[in-house]
């Protein structure tokens, strides 16, 4: 396949339409670092059952703040580190990654939920930052997706523009799957040095907050640009945060 600039722009246009932040009946707050590892989430949801954290990398400020606020256990999965330094008792660490099928060092979210006795829970929280593997798990094989009331995910688009074009159907499947079940309530662009490079006002790496649809009583498309002062913070301190406003009618 040869690179087609027009098709590349078309795929980027679709991404902007798939990921549109909404104002809802739920207030927002930040949990975690005031840099990479912190996320903007929604308040006012039913009491959480537990936190599932994928891709912690021995950095658990999010899990600590989650426990301090909600007093809930964390189930942390990361096959790239051997342990969590000064691990608190409320945090259960597993040296195991997450994928769309079981391997020697990976397993599915469904199996994790089942193994931990949460199969009947409807208010789990997930934090997912797995460096591109998110595309593998967000599909119809993810049977317990609606056991989660809120999910924050860092998405990683391919580095190469031609790979973006080749991934069009994957983007279609993933974001259709998510938007059928959840409302996008926030997006924040990661300001790492390798972006932005999509010349369509869309970042290559971005964090999205999703709330399950049945928990959102009112919503309308956000009318303000991001980042939000006091909530959003640059992932890479010392570099300017990236401004997003593509959802606002010009």
Range-by-range predicted roles:
Residues 1-50, 59, 95, 105-122, ...:
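Rossmann-like AdoMet/SAM-dependent catalytic core
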Residues 65-68, 82-91, 143-146:
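Short loop/helix-cap segments at secondary-structure boundaries that form the rim of catalytic
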Residues 134-173:
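A short alpha/beta connector and helix-capping loop motif
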Residues 96-99, 129:
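Conserved acidic residues
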Residues 126-133:
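Switch II (G3) loop of P-loop NTPases
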Residues 57-70:
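Conserved SAM-binding loop of SAM-dependent methyltransferases across substrates and taxa
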Residues 58-59, 76-84:
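Short, polar loop motifs at secondary-structure junctions
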């Amino acid at each position: 396949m040869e690179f087609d600039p027009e098709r590349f722009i078309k795929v980027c246009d679709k991404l902007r339409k798939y990921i549109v932040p909404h104002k809802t009946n739920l207030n927002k707050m930040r949990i975690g670092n005031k840099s990479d590892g912190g996320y903007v989430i929604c308040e006012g949801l039913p009491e959480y059952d537990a936190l599932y954290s994928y891709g912690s990398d021995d950095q658990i400020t999010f899990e600590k703040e989650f426990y301090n606020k909600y007093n809930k256990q964390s189930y942390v999965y990361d096959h790239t580190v051997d342990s969590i330094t000064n691990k608190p008792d409320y945090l259960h660490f597993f040296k195991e990654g997450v994928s769309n099928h079981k391997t020697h060092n990976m397993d599915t979210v469904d199996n994790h939920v089942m193994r931990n006795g949460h199969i009947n829970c409807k208010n789990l929280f997930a934090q997912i930052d797995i460096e591109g593997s998110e595309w593998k798990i967000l599909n119809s094989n993810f049977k317990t997706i609606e056991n989660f009331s809120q999910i924050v995910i860092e998405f990683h688009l391919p580095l190469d523009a031609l790979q973006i074009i080749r991934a069009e159907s994957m983007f279609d499947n993933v974001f259709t799957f998510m938007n059928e079940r959840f409302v996008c309530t926030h997006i924040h662009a990661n300001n790492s040095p390798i972006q932005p490079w999509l010349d369509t006002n869309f970042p290559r790496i971005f964090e999205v907050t999703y709330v399950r649809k049945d928990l959102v009583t009112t919503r309308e498309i956000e009318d303000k640009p991001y980042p939000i002062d006091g909530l959003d913070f640059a992932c890479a301190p010392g570099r300017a945060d990236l401004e997003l406003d593509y959802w606002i009618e010009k």
